[in-house]
Amino acid sequence: MNDDRQALTEDVLALLCSIAPEVDPAVIEHARPLRRQVDLDSMDWLNFLVGLNERFGVEIPESDYARLVSLGDVLDYLQAKLEQR
């Protein structure tokens, strides 16, 4: 993993832990559905997506929410959006 991807991963996991403090980031698998791994309800998930927007300045349209299933999906999405700047 390159340094930019590692930093992005750490930032995303820190945000996730701020919303769900019981989450152990060391056990999050990149390919499994994130909401199931950390048992986020719909409000927590929405707070997570809003937090991504605020932290990274990336607009996430509601139509894209369904694409953001796993941690890997979230990271790929953010990385692509950040590279478009």
Residue ranges, per PLM feature:
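Phosphopantetheine-dependent thiolation modules in NRPS/PKS and related acyl-activating systems
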Residues: 2-40, 44-50, 54-85
